[in-house]
Amino acid sequence: MKTIREQANEIMKEDTSHDVKREKLLKIGLTATDIQNLFFAERMAGREGRAARPVVEYTIDQILARYTFGVEIECYHVRVNELINKATERGLEMHSEGYNHRDNNTYYKLVSDGSIRGENPIECVSPILNGARGGFDTLKACCASLRECGAMVNRSTGLHIHVGGRITEKQYGNTFANYYYLESVIDSFMSPSRRENYYAKKLVGNVDAIVRARTFRQVSEAMNHDRYYKINCEAWGRHHTIEFRHHQGTTDYDKISYWARFCIKLVHWSADNRLNAPVRSIDDIPFLTDDEKTFFKDRANAFAGIAMVNEIMNVQ
């Protein structure tokens, strides 16, 4: 698969207008600032008789390095001591604690959660992670430990992703507005249990206020200071993060890591971009790579197939 740099170079060499190039560059994940720098470099190169080349371009590793993230995995059927032992064998520090919202940078913690149904329920909470500094490696070890000790999920469990870093007020407001316009297409690759859920409510009822919101305070007011939405504004005051609560419970590393990258890239793209209409297709999500689009389309097709089988069974 071509890197963003390679794709950007090819687009800049095309014999098309700046508007066409700008649209294509946005679709591969560049920000408005990145594109402005590219066009500036092109003009300067033209004056000096040299071939144009990109000045600013972010690889996925560079994007991940700019943000922190955290993962909360709700599950049940977990023997805590066994899970801690499995994690320790993989070099992962893990501790069992009572219910709390304390952040840390070093260890995974197991806490109680009264919303989870099933025997031996827990919420497995990661430390503050960075995707370019081994964060996904420790997450993979955590998922392997959970699956090895028989952790299970059901309709009452969810997966929460926190994204933090130097997020500007404009970027914050844009992220919520963009999520509103992406919500329906995201629903297509989420479990039906997460499309209408008390702990992850739809944003649609607050559309006017959300789209108008430009500041931390305005976003919180638009969301009625309620954290139980698919994207949670109240996490900012406590953790200085944006929390994504949309995803169903899972211990599968691929599902978690693809969704975590989606959330991080959405926040990054929102620094300079604000949608003004609903996105109808996964192919039209502007910050995803072809590989990521394929993954989420496969998830959407899987859920559509399950829905079709259920409909047939109900008819019979």
Predicted regions and their residues:
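Charged, low-complexity interaction regions
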Residues: M12-V20, G29-L30
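Terminal catalytic/cofactor-binding subdomain
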Residues: F40-C149
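Aromatic/basic-lined ligand-recognition segments
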Residues: T68-G70, I116, P121, G173-T250
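Helical (often loop-to-helix) elements that flank the catalytic cores of nucleotide-handling enzymes
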Residues: A132-C143, I167-S191, D252-V267, I306-V315
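Flexible helix-coil linker/hinge segments at domain or subdomain boundaries
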Residues: M152, S184-Y199, H268-T294
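Modules that initiate DNA replication and primer synthesis
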Residues: I231-D290
